[in-house]
Amino acid sequence: MKRKWEIEKLKDTKQFKKSADMILRNRIESLLSYIEKYFKDLSVESLHDVRIALRRVRYSMELFIICYDKKIFIKFYNKVQLLQDLSGNVRDVDISLENINYLVADNHIKIENDIILKANEKKFLLEEKFKLELMKFT
């Protein structure tokens, strides 16, 4: 079945395949490098770099599906998509915590420690799941 992002009139020429190989290799190598950095420094910035690299791999893949065996390609694409979703979940909690901290500081209000504690617990669990999937990927 054709995916919504497949471009119907693209042709699988030798030059196009060669370009696809070069671009995807570059994008995947870059992603692996950012994943390695993420494991050394579990910061918001390194998570952001991994998220950008995942996006670049995924969107490049969408252009080049016609160049590869569709079954294998989609399996790899789905792994990249899962990692992108998981990294987004971690980022969502980071943003929530930033917003809570901003509201507290800016409005001089107090909130229950339980809220921050629960958000941090959720972040920890999501990060662990994300790291596990990254390890499987690499």
Question: Where are the model-predicted features located?
Answer:
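Cationic, histidine-enriched alpha-helical/coil surfaces that engage anionic ligands
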Residues: 1-138
